[in-house]
Amino acid sequence: MAKGQSLQDPFLNALRRERVPVSIYLVNGIKLQGQVESFDQFVILLKNTVSQMVYKHAISTVVPARALHITPTQSSQPGYVQHDDAPAE
């Protein structure tokens, strides 16, 4: 798996598993809202009143409605880096 997906998959999987509402902004500025139903290497299936298949190359930003905490055990990918929310002292 590509190095760039070492954070992407655990993030999307946590959104899917916890059914967190998300706003997805496309590169053309359109805002989509719903819940991540499924995803693969190329698309995200977004469910609201209908299901939409959104190609990842068209996505600019994914904004969860609430904070997520992704633990290292949720990612078996090498190179996965967890950033703590606590400020450095």
From Swiss-Prot:
RNA chaperone that binds small regulatory RNA (sRNAs) and mRNAs to facilitate mRNA translational regulation in response to envelope stress, environmental stress and changes in metabolite concentrations. Also binds with high specificity to tRNAs. GO terms for biological process: regulation of DNA-templated transcription; regulation of RNA stability; regulation of translation, ncRNA-mediated. Residues 9-68 form the Sm domain. It comes from Shewanella denitrificans (strain OS217 / ATCC BAA-1090 / DSM 15013). One of its GO terms (cellular component) is cytosol. Keywords: RNA-binding, Stress response. HAMAP family: Hfq. This is RNA-binding protein Hfq. Belongs to the Hfq family. Homohexamer. Transmembrane segments: none annotated. CDD domains: Hfq. Signal peptide: none annotated. One of its GO terms (molecular function) is RNA binding.
